[in-house]
């Protein structure tokens, strides 16, 4: 009887740990080598690079979640934004077509990987295939419009 009680307690603690740790997995940082490749994929898909130099750029970069797609709409025009505060310190700006092209590039099978390719590449790629966030999640959307006015 004591064994059964201990087993239930262990299961309960394990389940709570698993459920409370799940949000942390979603925020797992992407590897630097994946981010290098990802910048190339974004550019190949037609995303334009807007360097976040200067006060407006820094404000816009910090208003976006790092390494996540966000759909931002201003003046009836929607743009897909991807902030990269680690590698290029920039925001990639593109259309829905650019985003779909990017997803197509990322979804293609890699084939045989050389030994120097990180084992977590597939996990990183799957993370990037998550649905983009809506613009309503951005803290101060006007700061983005001001910085990215060339794209609207």
Regions found by a protein language model. Give the residues of each.
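C-terminal partner/receptor-binding element of secreted or periplasmic proteins
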Residues: 33, 97-152
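N-terminal secretory signal peptides
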Residues: 26-75
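Mid-chain, structured segments of secreted extracytoplasmic proteins
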Residues: 67-111
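Bacterial N-terminal signal peptides
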Residues: 10-21
């Amino acid at each position: 009887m004591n064994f059964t009680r201990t087993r239930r307690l262990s299961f309960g603690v394990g389940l709570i740990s698993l459920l409370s740790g799940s949000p942390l997995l979603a925020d797992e940082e992407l590897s630097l080598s994946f981010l290098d490749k990802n910048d190339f994929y974004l550019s190949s898909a037609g995303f334009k690079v807007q360097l976040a130099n200067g006060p407006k750029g820094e404000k816009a970069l910090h208003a976006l979640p790092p390494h996540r797609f966000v759909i931002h709409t201003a003046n009836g025009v929607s743009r897909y934004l991807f902030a990269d505060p680690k590698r290029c310190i920039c925001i990639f700006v593109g259309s829905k077509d650019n985003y779909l092209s990017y997803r197509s590039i990322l979804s293609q099978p890699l084939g045989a990987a050389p030994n120097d390719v990180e084992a977590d590449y597939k996990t990183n790629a799957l993370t990037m295939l998550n649905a983009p966030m809506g613009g309503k999640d951005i803290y101060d959307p006007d700061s983005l419009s001001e910085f990215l006015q060339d794209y609207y």
